[in-house]
């Protein structure tokens, strides 16, 4: 019995160590509260044990200081951080910037010593006041002239966090969201330098394809497709990860993005294969109400009566129904991605976003909340 008890304890220890070895970074978006009916998501819907880190998106910058964006952000901050009462190991970060913020605003702040200093000084007290463990910089698509300013911002922010922690508090975490497109990486990021000062980098390995391309294609392929044009050879997660590592990002700081949303297209002809022409983005989802984008829970509804396919080379699924063509991820594809990042010895996975997964567990017929995020977690926990 003694040997069996000891063995069981060892297995449990290995499982805990295995799960703890990988980060599962999960974004939550504050605007998801405004979706109608069952699409409305608040932080109290989140399982506190699902992710290792939850990032609240987004904070604003007003008068060069970090600030709230939504009218009820402070209430939502408190609701999110209350999750740590149930799971004290959970880390929460506040993301500043995002798509609607605009790279020009970041550029204006970071390029001037005084405004940059004002912003940096405002961050630690704001995070401490609202119970966050760190900051996520979502300066998306910085320009060529912004490269050194972003590096300086990251370096000085990390130094400020270190100084603030000298009072005896745990140092605040610092992360950044980085585009996975080769052109965007080359133009705006000194990967080797910013990696030195960041605790982790969330690589946005999705949105490689969209309605702006005039043809159908998958937005989050794991690998290059055999039928991809030479211009698309960089547009996959495998290339983006390899390129980031080649540029000097440490594997133990690189987190690979996995989307819980799909991209939809309206076909312009009866053709449905790769490269088929489109007339524009797909019709809006019932809850997200944005052309060309569908939450996973909306995709589950779409799949009723649809024809499903899988790109074997890219290892991702798509579905067609009428004149609608939808690229998405399912449990099989996200598990493959999680196994891939483990094989590459990356720091973990990032999910965009919890509120786009089937967070209620009522849409996808699996009787499981957050089925995609849970599938990623299960693979990360495998020995």
UniProtKB/Swiss-Prot annotation:
Residues involved in chitin binding: 70-71, 97-100, 141, 204-207, 263, 352
PROSITE patterns the UniProt entry points to: GH18_2 (PS51910)
Cellular compartment(s): Secreted, Extracellular space; Cytoplasm; Cytoplasm, Perinuclear region; Endoplasmic reticulum
Glycosylation sites recorded in the entry for this protein: 60, 367
CDD domains: GH18_chitolectin_chitotriosidase
Keywords recorded for this protein, A-Z: Antimicrobial, Apoptosis, Cytoplasm, Disulfide bond, Endoplasmic reticulum, Glycoprotein, Inflammatory response, Lectin, Secreted, Signal
Disulphide bond pairs: 26-51, 300-364
A GO molecular-function descriptor: chitin binding
GO BP: any one term: response to interleukin-6
Principal subcellular localization: secreted
Region called Important for AKT1 activation and IL8 production, residue ranges: 324-338
Annotated GO CC locations: cytoplasm; endoplasmic reticulum; extracellular space; perinuclear region of cytoplasm
Presence of keyword Endoplasmic reticulum: yes
Annotated ranges, domain GH18: 22-383
Keyword hit for Signal: yes
Family note: Belongs to the glycosyl hydrolase 18 family.
Subunit composition and interactions: Monomer.
Function: Carbohydrate-binding lectin with a preference for chitin. Has no chitinase activity. May play a role in tissue remodeling and in the capacity of cells to respond to and cope with changes in their environment. Plays a role in T-helper cell type 2 (Th2) inflammatory response and IL-13-induced inflammation, regulating allergen sensitization, inflammatory cell apoptosis, dendritic cell accumulation and M2 macrophage differentiation. Facilitates invasion of pathogenic enteric bacteria into colonic mucosa and lymphoid organs.
Protein name per the record: Chitinase-3-like protein 1
């Amino acid at each position: 019995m003694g040997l069996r008890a000891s063995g069981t304890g060892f297995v449990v220890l290995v499982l805990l160590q295995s799960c703890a070895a990988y980060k599962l970074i999960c974004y939550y978006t504050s605007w998801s509260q405004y979706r109608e009916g069952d699409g409305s998501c608040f932080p109290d819907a989140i399982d506190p044990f699902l992710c290792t880190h939850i990032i609240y998106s987004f904070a604003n910058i007003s008068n060069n200081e970090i600030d709230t964006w939504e009218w009820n952000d402070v209430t939502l901050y408190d609701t999110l951080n209350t999750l740590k009462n149930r799971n004290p190991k959970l880390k929460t970060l506040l993301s500043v910037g995002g798509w609607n913020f605009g790279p020009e605003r970041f550029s204006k702040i970071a390029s001037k010593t005084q405004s940059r200093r004002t912003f940096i000084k405002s961050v630690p007290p704001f995070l401490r006041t609202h119970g966050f463990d760190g900051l996520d910089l979502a300066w998306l698509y910085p320009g060529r002239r912004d490269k050194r300013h972003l590096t300086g911002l990251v370096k000085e922010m990390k130094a400020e966090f270190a100084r603030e922690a000298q009072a005896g508090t745990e140092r605040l975490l610092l992360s950044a969201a980085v585009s996975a497109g080769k052109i965007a990486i080359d133009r705006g990021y000194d990967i080797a330098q910013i990696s030195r000062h960041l605790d982790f980098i969330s690589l946005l390995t999705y949105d490689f394809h969209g309605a702006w391309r005039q043809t159908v294609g998958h937005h989050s392929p794991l690998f290059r497709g055999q039928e991809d044009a030479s211009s698309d050879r960089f547009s996959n997660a495998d290339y983006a990860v390899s390129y980031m590592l080649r540029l000097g990002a440490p594997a133990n700081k690189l987190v690979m993005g996995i989307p819980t949303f799909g991209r939809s297209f309206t076909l312009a002809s009866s053709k449905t294969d790769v490269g088929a022409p489109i007339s524009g983005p797909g019709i809006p989802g019932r809850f997200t109400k944005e052309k060309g984008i569908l939450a996973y829970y909306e995709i589950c509804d779409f799949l009723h009566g649809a024809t499903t396919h899988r790109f074997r080379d890219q290892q991702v699924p798509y579905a067609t129904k009428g004149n609608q063509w939808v690229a998405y991820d399912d449990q099989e594809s996200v598990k493959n991605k999680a196994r891939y990042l483990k094989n590459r010895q990356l720091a973990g996975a990032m999910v965009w976003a919890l509120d786009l997964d089937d967070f209620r567990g009522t849409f996808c017929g699996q009787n499981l909340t957050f089925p995609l995020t849970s599938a990623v977690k299960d693979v990360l926990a495998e020995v």
